[in-house]
């Protein structure tokens, strides 16, 4: 993977006006995008959004450069679709971190991380859970006004939220016996 990444970057630098340089940008994004997926993830059923989002950010940036520089490229529609996926994955990562803080009793850190996810990733599906983390965190901190504000926003945007009924049911990996 590293050598392919270096080759694509070298091609972009050396031949920026080549008629097919858009493919090099696309390839650079794919290399980082596929870095998130491995056989271990598949076998362990690990959620890729629980991993460090560095590769996701790099993939997003590469796809963004492709879309901005070559809006008419044949690779642009796929790059846009992958960018949407990556935004959702990065938002979900922030929510995972917020939940981690909440479980450890760091309620202020949990609320701040959830708030960061909401500000940075406005359209992501993970925002419903981020709002729920904020509601629980502010409640645990005794900040009733902030809790009520977050709950009002959540009810307005997600009136039928699964979090009102205990949250989504998660299927545990085969190796998690307890």
State each model region's role.
Residues 1-178:
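Acidic, polar-rich low-complexity tracts and alpha-helical solenoid repeat scaffolds
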């Amino acid at each position: 993977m590293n050598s392919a990444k270096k080759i694509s970057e070298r091609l972009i630098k050396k031949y920026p006006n080549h008629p097919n340089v858009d493919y090099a940008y696309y390839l650079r994004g794919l290399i980082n995008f596929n870095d998130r997926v491995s056989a271990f993830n598949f076998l362990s059923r690990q959620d890729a959004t629980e991993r460090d989002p560095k590769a996701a950010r790099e993939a997003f940036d590469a796809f963004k450069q492709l879309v901005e520089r070559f809006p008419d490229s044949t690779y642009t529609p796929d790059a846009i679709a992958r960018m949407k996926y990556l935004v959702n994955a990065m938002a979900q990562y922030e929510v995972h971190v917020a939940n981690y803080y909440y479980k450890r009793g760091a309620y202020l850190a949990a609320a701040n991380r959830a708030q960061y996810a909401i500000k940075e990733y406005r359209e992501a599906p993970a925002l419903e859970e981020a709002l729920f983390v904020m509601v629980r965190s502010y409640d645990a901190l005794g900040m009733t006004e902030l809790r009520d504000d977050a709950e009002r926003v959540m009810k307005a945007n997600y009136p039928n939220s699964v979090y009102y009924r205990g949250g989504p049911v998660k299927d545990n990996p085969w190796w998690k016996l307890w």
